[in-house]
């Protein structure tokens, strides 16, 4: 939020990232858009790169793909794409896309399968990606990006 101190209008985040998560955080001055993008009924996908210690068996990734039972209920199926196994450094890297917005959901899902998250980075929300944007940097959306977000939010 410190990055936006000079902004002439009030802006607020669409969703949140926990303290140990980095990556894309959409900021807006449009309350209706924010509310609709955050509401689970709109099923807005958020994609993360996850790094966990150890080599995750395919069966464990498959559990994430069908949904897992957390203390606050069953999760919706997630899209999971294996990026790499590093046998030498003993970690697994994968993408996971979810459309729910439960507190620390990706971390809790990984805990459930027995592979706690070491690093977590949100790389995409709906049609927006952080490609080409350095850590701690921000930019305004293009008119096309905003129109696509409004379409996703059904505005």
What is the role of each PLM region?
Residues 1-155:
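Basic, flexible Lys/Arg- and Gly-enriched helix-loop patches that mediate nucleic-acid binding at interfaces
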């Amino acid at each position: 939020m410190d990055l936006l101190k000079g902004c002439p209008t009030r802006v607020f985040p669409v969703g949140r990232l926990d303290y140990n998560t980095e990556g894309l955080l959409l900021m807006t001055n449009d309350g209706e858009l924010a509310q609709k993008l955050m509401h689970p009924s709109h099923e807005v996908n958020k994609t993360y790169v996850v790094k966990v210690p150890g080599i995750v068996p395919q069966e464990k990734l498959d559990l994430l793909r069908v949904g897992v039972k957390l203390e606050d209920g069953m999760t919706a199926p997630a899209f999971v794409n294996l990026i790499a196994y590093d046998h030498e450094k003993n970690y697994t890297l994968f993408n996971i896309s979810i459309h729910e917005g439960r507190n620390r959901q990706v971390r809790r899902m990984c805990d459930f399968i027995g592979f706690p998250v070491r690093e977590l980075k949100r790389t995409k929300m709906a049609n927006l990606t952080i490609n080409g944007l350095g850590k701690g940097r921000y930019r305004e959306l293009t008119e096309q990006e905003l129109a696509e977000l409004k379409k996703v939010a059904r505005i």
